Amino acid sequence: MPRGRKSRRRRNAKAAEENRNNRKIQASEASKTPMAASVTPSTPEEYLSGPEEDTSTPEKASSTLAEASSTALVQKPVTRSNFQGTKKSLLMSILALIFIMGNSAKEALVWKVLGKLGMQPGRQHSIFGDPKKVVTEEFVRRGYLIYKPVPRSSPVEYEFFWGPRAHVESSKLKVMHFVARVRNRCSKDWPCNYDWDSDDDAEVEAILNSGARGSSAP
């Protein structure tokens, strides 16, 4: 075999060996990197982290949620492939609002929050069409939300609750994680009506230990 051909083979073999070594080094470094810092957000709640501001009232808390939710909804251009993810971000925002308000949220408050995101009932939205149909029909039909009149209200008001499918697919822990990331602090600092117990404290502690306190959207 000519010397030139042997020399090229040796160089190619050496380059291949260097590439393998580089990949091993990169894999080793990646394994040492905390998951929160190394993984691109892939679920609705992972896109949200809110600014530090006064949330001493439910109205201010919902305002912070609206601002953080807008980050999720405009994180990247909407295409066919990520439209469903955007809709999931909208749903998670509503579920979180219901949670922090004590397991139910009046329709007026929901639309006040969504109004800050440019969504009004009956008015066409560039992404969702009629947002009221998405929220009160699609999410209700699919079992994520319950939408019913407030007892003894006059004039009649409506309120939202978690639907059965939300309880199965979006556990309390997941929504507490969402809230913790929005506020970038322990979930129980929110001025909500939820009755905390020791199990909840343990869950929030686990969230904070997993990196929720220091996480932020990229």
Curated annotation (Swiss-Prot):
Coiled coil: none
Biased composition (Basic residues): 1-13
SMART domains: MAGE
UniProt xrefs under Pfam families: MAGE
Compositionally biased tracts (Low complexity): 61-71
Region feature Disordered, mapped onto this chain: 1-71
Protein name stated in the entry: Melanoma-associated antigen H1
Organism listed in the record: Rattus norvegicus (Rat)
Gene coding for it: Mageh1
